[in-house]
């Protein structure tokens, strides 16, 4: 089957690892948010989307960015300390978390570089419900936003460490959300520092099983 424009868009969607120090126009930001708003949500919870999905736009030059990024770094350092203690006492945990520990070490020592580079930090929040599906709903929103950003030539990067801040009272208070009632996650958008190369991988037959 011949590839379509959508196939090309999906192949072009790559995680942006470095950003230019440039400012995004509000119209582009809003179009990305609109794509996220249209993403599927957990309708089985019985709560309307307007009552359970929120987006927080944190511009790099804003005072809010300074406060929130400082709280994020504090949380990273606290989690690193807790994990270091746990690794001493839980058998096998040190080996299992080796790569993650290196990541925490880098973030704790040098800060969250891409957070300081990107034009905008978008925090998505979804109200918790039953059955719990808020994390999936945020993931759906980010997939839509990522595709829209790619279409606009804007770099996009998931900032998954934002998720751990759902349990941070001070951070959630900055957003005006009650800790324990909302799940959050984040992404970064901005003009990419360098062009990305489309993904040329093909689906291998070994990854597919046709069940009769």
Residue ranges and their predicted role:
Residues 107-111, 173, 206:
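Short, P/G- and charge-enriched loop/turn segments at secondary-structure junctions
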Residues 19, 130-134, 196:
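A generic structural signal for short coil/turn motifs at secondary-structure boundaries
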Residues 52-54, 118-121, 183-184:
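Short, surface-exposed beta-edge/turn micro-motifs
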Residues 36-39, 122, 126-171:
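Small-aliphatic-rich amphipathic alpha-helix that forms the alpha element of a beta-alpha
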Residues 47-50, 113-116, 175-180, 201-202:
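Solvent-exposed alpha-helices and their adjacent loops that cap or buttress functional pockets
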Residues 1-2, 6-16, 180-212:
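C-terminal helix-cap and adjacent tail motif
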Residues 50-51, 154-160, 182-183:
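A short coil-to-beta-strand element that immediately follows conserved catalytic motifs
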Residues 1-115, 212:
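N-terminal amphipathic, basic helical "cap/leader" segment at the start of enzyme domains
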